């Protein structure tokens, strides 16, 4: 499946959009869905999930107003992973502290049958290939939302990471990066 991370559209339109119109436009240009369904309540999550289904589209994970809600709603909607995303993943956070937070999130997600997956990203705690590999070694329960563009910009080799950690991939973000 090919989806799109619609974060850029949120930024472009300042968060002011109609989700049904957005999905129809994405479907018209060939996308199968988006990576994340973002919801503010259980009812909002169900309403938006029904909208995706009505259009024959899909999403991979659900983000709620807090980590626990995102995990629960992701599980309830039959999806398999959530992002490891919290205040403990900032660039200046100690690596061991970030790993401890991530391990707790992996346990919490695991109780719901969901994998917590690290998203490597410039400016975040896990940015370079070395940091990504150290993180995956330190937090063996974590899946991987591999961002090829950010890894390349950090000097890494996405193909090597895929070969080495294919069994931990939750999703891959493909980007066209000019180095």
Model-derived features: positions:
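Short, hinge-like loop/turn segments at secondary-structure boundaries
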Residues: 51-55, 72, 76-80, 101, ...
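Acidic/histidine-rich catalytic cores of soluble enzymes
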Residues: 34, 107-179
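Active-site-adjacent beta->alpha loops and helix N-cap segments on the catalytic face
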Residues: 40-49, 90-103, 125-128
């Amino acid at each position: 499946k090919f989806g799109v991370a619609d974060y850029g559209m949120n930024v472009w339109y300042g968060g002011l959009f109609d989700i049904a119109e957005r999905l129809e436009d994405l479907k018209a240009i060939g996308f199968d869905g988006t990576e994340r369904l973002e919801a503010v309540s259980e009812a909002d999550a169900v309403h938006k999930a029904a909208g995706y289904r009505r259009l024959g589209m899909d999403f991979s994970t659900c983000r709620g107003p807090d980590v626990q809600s995102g995990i629960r709603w992701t599980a309830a909607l039959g999806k398999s992973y959530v992002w490891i995303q919290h205040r403990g993943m900032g660039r200046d956070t100690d690596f061991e502290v970030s790993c401890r937070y991530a391990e707790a999130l992996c346990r919490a997600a695991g109780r719901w049958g969901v994998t917590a997956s690290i998203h490597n990203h410039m400016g975040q705690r896990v940015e370079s290939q070395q940091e990504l590999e150290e993180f995956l070694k330190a937090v063996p329960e974590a899946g991987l939302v591999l961002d090829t563009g950010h890894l390349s910009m950090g000097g890494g080799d996405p193909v090597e990471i895929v070969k080495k950690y294919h069994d931990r991939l939750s999703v891959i973000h493909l980007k066209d990066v000019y180095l």
